[in-house]
């Protein structure tokens, strides 16, 4: 891999763009020879000086801003530029168009190599309801859920029905991640507040409500290799303090949560969770690497969702799990880049 081969693309227009900056900081440190391109919240793209990226502080809470005028007004313009020709893009994007298949389609149309899943699998994974249906079809246990549609009254009625059957709910965006926009519904008052706030965001943001399962929270990475083999990484366990949720602050700022890698669960549960994650990865048609969130209830592991471009920050689960199995981050990144090139070559 030469200095001219790789472009780390990060930032983006989604509400997960700050996590993307933190991922890019970590990836750029491990791949010092790569170029770094920043997509601003307005969609414009500009090469980012490495020193600027490295010096940016409080990435989870502060937007990165580059001085001057953007090099290209849009990602399409950047990908059409001569600077993109023949490059391999390492996608350090999270959420929105960076993870829902939009960016992937733009790269595919131009025959450019990129890491992670293709556009079709990305779109499937980003839609939680669609992903859950595909996982269930593959034999994975899921929980009852309902998409919240209509006005606040209709949403409240749907929440009340689900609440009556299950006693506690989780409400979250159908297309989103990093625990942004998460609501825990424990009673009528919570249901009313969630219905009002979700209705205020419709139709721009679609939400689903699903039954809450009491149990152990696990998350499991799955990694593809050049030899065609696929493996589950060691499970991570999330312990949440009473009264808190594994929301953005818990996930990235460490408030009220404890992460354990490897998870401290019985071997049979550990292996069942790994098998579930591999099944979900395959059911969605994913490539490269994913991370699947699971809750282990009284009846065993239950599928929640799959992240097709999981975080690679210093605090993220994939780096934790790679370290737990004894794999350094650089060889993992290099293999993902090699997989990206191999896919591009197959599709030519």
Where are the regions a protein language model picked out?
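Active-site nucleotide/adenylate-binding loops and adjacent lid/helix of ATP-dependent enzymes
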Residues: 2, 6-10, 14, 82, ...
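ATP-binding N-terminal substructure of ATP-dependent carboxylate-amine bond-forming enzymes
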Residues: 1-120, 124-126, 130, 148-157, ...
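Solvent-exposed alpha-helix faces
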Residues: 25-26, 196, 278
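Hydrophobic beta-strand scaffold residues
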Residues: 113-114, 142, 169, 329
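Phosphate-binding site of ATP-dependent enzymes
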Residues: 186-268, 272-275, 296, 301-302
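Generic enzyme active-site microenvironment
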Residues: 115, 170, 208, 291, ...
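ATP-dependent carboxylate activation and anion-phosphoryl transfer catalytic cores
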Residues: 266-348
